[in-house]
Amino acid sequence: MKAAEIREKFLKFFESKGHTIVRSSSLVPGNDPTLLFTNSGMVQFKDVFLGAESRPYSRATTAQRSVRAGGKHNDLENVGYTARHHTFFEMLGNFSFGDYFKRDAIHYAWELLTGVYQLPKDKLWVTVYHEDDEAHDIWAKEVGVPVERIIRIGDNKGARYASDNFWQMADTGPCGPCSEIFYDHGPDVWGGPPGSPEEDGDRYIEIWNLVFMQFNRDAQGNMTPLPKQCVDTGMGLERIAAVLQHVHSNYEIDLFQALIKAAARETGVSDLTNNSLKVIADHIRACSFLIVDGVIPGNEGRGYVLRRIVRRAIRHGYKLGKKGSFFHRMVADLVAQMGAAYPELKEAEQRVTDVLRQEEERFFETIEHGMSILEGALAELEAGSSKTLDGELAFKLHDTYGFPLDLTADVCREREVTVDEAAFDEAMTRQREQARAAGKFKMAQGLEYSGEKTTFHGYDEVVFDDAKVIALYVEGASVQQASQGQQAVVVLDHTPFYAESGGQVGDQGVLANASVRFAVSDTLKVQADVVGHHGTLEQGTLKVGDVVKAEIDAVRRARTARNHSATHLMHKALREVLGTHVQQKGSLVDADKTRFDFAHNAPLTDEQIRRVEEIVNAEVLANAPGIVRVMSFDEAVKGGAMALFGEKYGDEVRVLDLGFSRELCGGTHVHRTGDIGLFKIVMEGGVAAGIRRVEAITGDNAVRFVQDLDARINAAAAVLKAQPSELTQRIVQVQDQVKSLEKELSALKSKMASSQGDELAGQAIEVGGVHVLAATLEGADVKTLRETVDKLKDKLKSAAIVLASVEGGKVSLIAGVTADASRKVKAGELVNFVAQQVGGKGGGRPDMAQAGGTEPANLPAALAGVKGWVESQL
């Protein structure tokens, strides 16, 4: 039974039992930004289990795409070397949300395994939590599993309820016992039943875990029954396929064999048992589906995990002798295997291929040099007694050659060498500190402060009349007063000034009273809720305890707000035009523009840019109100607000609804979309592999931009004596005229050169039977020089010729030698003889060579020496 059929039978079986088939969710969890990747079937139902979300069904079944690589769940180093470790796998599951419980879950599992899949009953063993008599009795008395094949597993992890057979979502919350089903491969395979000293062997393989969410655990460890008991089960498709296909390794199932053969084809390897082929076959699945779900190779977060997996696959291909791109060509093979089950893979095939090809090309630029350095270091270790690679070297490989630490460790492991990870971490920390010191980091980040928090009023006010100075810093040190002319940081108890955050720059403005004026040039956070006002004391003496009027530059704030609100609309529009894989990777919003970096693997076309502008400006014209609500993070995400992985969110978040956009945002914004005014994209380009950047302007800036553009178009039209509407046509006409004139000019130059060539032939001097000619051809370009040399060679029969021209202070040289003379006189050596004297160099074939120089004053003497040089060669 093939993997595709196993998947289909699972889903159809539970559909027949009243379950709704639910599509696999994204590998990027939409409801939990703290989770790196979706790693089980229950992730998309987490809020349902917690009671925070309701679904129109109480029974569900899924085939969930899952990844375990990076973070807590990291199987990367074992992938390819064991029978059952993968970065990507499919989890088949059935779920009950307050509907059926243990009895039905157990009976369903048994019916599917023994009835639909027709596994021998005597090959199946089960485990239960040692206190779960209910599950034990259902297995023994109702299903009929012999008690000797039902194993009670106790608290084998050192504490009450700390057991392989007791599941917990977290330290508190829903939890309960679980029952695992094992398949016995028979006595020919080493290993013992679960709970025995030999349980790590391969004879008894877990194929299905049935989790019974029965209790709620509080902070004190007390267990109380849940009002709605739930079921969460998970069976790895690859594991059950290995059992049903009578093989002992997941890599031997049909799905993997097809990918292993594809890897062998691309790397030219014939041994299909090679572990590197298994690595590549596994990694093409993880990489492709991560890209499908919007992850792009990068240097942080999910993007860096993806980059590590891609580069590990490339390294194993390199190990097999593949010195060029190959990995991306396997996407088509994966689509053939899994495209029917996951149409989103088929739809994204070209995008996935392009992203992988770009990442391969990027790494192949450095892998050979990096591997050479690593191999040299390993050879030195083998010659000595140490078995530890220097962490500083591992960091150099990471920093200079793009080798992730686990890739270096992977290579070392094959030689039984470890990496000094502590030294690697020290080098990484040192580099970060140097980067911070070298970067433009403002004083606020290093200030020591332990006072009260700043209350922010800037969402509603641009002025706060009675703000009290609660701290002062000069040159990074806490002081009680600042004097006129000093630069300082002022901390207030209340402020309307927005501190730089979320890509939005800090406010500028003034702090003042009757005797003091402090010009604020920037606003930064000293701590999460403490605002530092950076600037210069222009008048008076400012003391801790003084009361000042805090007033922001309202015009600058309004422009910044327009740009920030436009960023939200543009983000949404980009996702509509390019696809939901578009994710924000960085932004900068100030009074002049918005700069937005996002995940996308190709330049935007003119039509795509125009479409984004149309969508945003349509939202502006709709003049929709901006609605701000404060709510819990879970409620915000449930309501569709976009949350960014890696951002830190508190228990309560600020949600901005603006037109068709809904995002979590703490920045300042317009009251209505119409306040944005005109929106115009002025730049689009790439900033890194898979990352594009768009810059846009709004309001009066956009109007001025369009007016300036209009003025330039009108001026250009006037120069070309055309109407603006006819400008393109007129430019094409001028280009055609220029091409025609260039063609005529080239013909005239050729004719002139031919004429000069006839005259120059008479200047040749015979030396040892070879006609030697060295001369300057006025006004000739390189093409004309070459044509003239060819004609002179034909005319003179046996010759060594150097022709030169001077244009803009630069010398062009062409040397030509006829075939009979080139055995002794080489054109490359001849042209270099002249070039070295005019400050240049060159080279070429024995019969024709080219050079240049920058010292035309030396040209006459250099050409005069050609005759003597040729004589010396004959």
From Swiss-Prot:
Keywords: Aminoacyl-tRNA synthetase, ATP-binding, Cytoplasm, Ligase, Metal-binding, Nucleotide-binding, Protein biosynthesis, RNA-binding, tRNA-binding, Zinc
Family matches, as SUPFAM superfamilies: Class II aaRS and biotin synthetases (SSF55681), Putative anticodon-binding domain of alanyl-tRNA synthetase (AlaRS) (SSF101353), ThrRS/AlaRS common domain (SSF55186), Translation proteins (SSF50447)
Cytoplasm recorded as keyword: yes
UniProt-recorded Gene Ontology molecular function terms: alanine-tRNA ligase activity; aminoacyl-tRNA deacylase activity; ATP binding; tRNA binding; zinc ion binding
Any Pfam family the entry gives: tRNA_SAD
Cofactor note: Binds 1 zinc ion per subunit.
Membership in a protein family: Belongs to the class-II aminoacyl-tRNA synthetase family.
Protein name per its UniProtKB record: Alanine--tRNA ligase
Organism of derivation: Paraburkholderia xenovorans (strain LB400)
